[in-house]
A protein has these predicted regions:
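N-terminal "arm"/small-domain region of PLP-dependent enzymes with the aminotransferase-like
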Residues: 2-75, 79-80, 85-86, 368-371
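Short, solvent-exposed loop/turn segments at secondary-structure junctions
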Residues: 38-42, 102-103, 139-141, 162, ...
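Conserved core of the PLP fold type I
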Residues: 60, 66-211, 222-244, 359, ...
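Conserved core segment of the aminotransferase class I/II
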Residues: 98, 238-319, 332, 419
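Conserved glycine-rich beta-strand-loop-beta hairpin in the small C-terminal domain of fold type I
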Residues: 312-326, 338-353
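Conserved PLP-binding active-site segment of the aspartate aminotransferase-like
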Residues: 351-356, 373-415
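Short amphipathic alpha-helices in soluble, non-transmembrane regions
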Residues: 362-368, 406-411
Length: 424
């Protein structure tokens, strides 16, 4: 098959007629498929169901002499802090264990910077005229929603194969109103990029003009390989301390895609000084998070080695789904020259870049044919993709058979949108 751009107008018209007919056939199937969010499938959730049988007798609820059924331990039970320190490669004293969502802790961290200021703030951010934030793109839509909700001016910085464009980042942080930066350093959402060692070093070594700059390190996929062995990653907290930036980084992780998205455990890791500061503030809003759930996770996951064994089981379920999507893109899209895409080996997403001006149209056609996907523009601040080209595919939820149907629809819609753009 020729690339669409190399076809004659007559060839494109013939191709358009064939693709349009295929699209109408797919519409007539009455499909209702969803690839919108990176949800674990039922089969993955079933792997973890035995966690609910671990606490049955009264004595089971005691950990390190603490009865987890009672009040207290705002920063998390010691056993949970040890577990997540082991997984993240930091110290237990640097870990705060919260409720089921790391996103809540991210929101809380930004919120407290606005209401109270951080340890090195001259004043709470709500009293500042302007707050700006660095946003690597394409990125995670919910990160952008957090900063947008506080009226922050978000500055897009392009991602490269090594991570964010560090030359641009290092220039931006010279502005004292630039107060933070979002990061998903391992298997980034949505591209699956792993930050290089040099990028991580440059981030840790930054000297921002703002004394209270927040390096937000969302390590959501720290153990989420599906097509390779576990990849060790630098301890950003220790690295920042080595460069004199001990209080700059705030690391986040959760078990949302290890155990249950709706009943997992979210954590924040940072310097001991930051953990003490946030514990003091959070102690006003809660007397403690769900310590019973924290203990369940300690007993079920045990340590990093056992957790990685569980992640291999998740990987065995996920890998065929990613392969199904990538195989379809290889066969149906790559030869036509109408999109580029990444081949992740970890994380939960596949990122596709269409020809400029085709993402919204592709997704509108998908919806018409019964396939729901992440909205166009979601991977950019304010939901505005300047090229209207990036699409995030989430293969994890549907069974492989449904996924193959959904990706067939996607490929057909992408072809149709590209042909329309080329004037077929």
């Amino acid at each position: 098959m020729k690339k669409y751009t190399e076809m004659t107008p007559q060839e494109r018209q013939a191709e358009y007629a064939a693709v349009k007919a295929k699209f109408e056939q797919l519409k007539d199937m009455g499909l209702s498929l969803n690839m919108a969010r990176g949800k674990p499938s039922k089969v993955q959730l079933d792997l973890v169901t035995p966690i609910f049988g671990l606490l049955t007798k009264p004595e089971d609820f005691v950990s390190d002499g603490i009865d987890v059924r009672n009040y207290g331990e705002v920063a998390g039970i010691p056993a949970a802090r040890r577990l997540f320190a082991d997984i993240l490669g930091c110290k237990p004293e640097q870990v705060f264990v919260g409720g089921n969502a790391s996103l809540q802790l991210m929101y809380d961290a930004v919120s407290k910077a606005f209401t109270h200021g951080l340890a090195h703030s001259e004043k709470p951010w709500c009293k500042l005229d302007k707050v700006k934030w660095i946003c690597p793109v394409p990125g995670y839509d919910r990160h952008f929603k957090v900063t947008e909700s506080f009226g922050v001016e978000m500055i897009a910085v392009p991602m490269t194969a090594e991570g964010p464009d560090m030359d641009k980042v290092e220039e931006l942080i010279k502005d004292p109103t630039v107060k933070g930066m979002w990061n998903v350093p391992k298997y980034s959402n949505p591209e699956g990029v792993v930050y290089s060692a040099e990028t991580v070093r440059r981030l840790a070594a930054m000297k921002p003009a703002a004394p209270d700059f927040m390096l937000m390190w969302d390590n959501a996929y720290c153990i989420h390989e599906f097509d390779c062995d576990f990849v060790e990653f630098p301890d950003i907290i220790d690295l920042c301390a080595q460069y004199g930036n001990a209080d700059m980084v705030y690391e986040f992780a959760s078990t949302s895609k290890v155990t249950f998205p709706g009943a997992g455990v979210g954590v924040m890791a940072s310097s001991e000084a930051n953990i003490a500061y946030f514990t003091k503030l959070i102690n006003i809003q809660t007397i403690g998070f769900d310590k019973i759930n924290q203990l369940r996770h300690v007993l079920f996951l045990k340590d990093r080695a056992h957790t990685l064994e569980l992640m291999k089981q998740h990987a065995a379920i996920l890998a065929p789904k990613f392969h199904a999507v990538l195989d379809a893109l290889d066969q149906e899209i790559a030869p036509l020259g109408i999109a580029d895409y990444k081949r992740p080996v970890g994380g939960y997403f596949i990122s596709v870049d269409t020809m400029p001006g085709c993402a919204k149209r592709t997704l509108a056609l998908c919806k018409e044919a019964g396939v729901t996907m992440t909205g166009a523009g979601a991977t950019f601040p304010y939901g505005k993709d300047p090229q209207d080209s990036n699409i995030r595919i989430a293969p994890s939820l549907p069974p492989v058979a449904e996924l193959e149907q959904a990706i067939a629809v996607f490929c057909t819609c992408l072809k149709l949108a590209a042909l329309e753009k080329l004037g077929a």
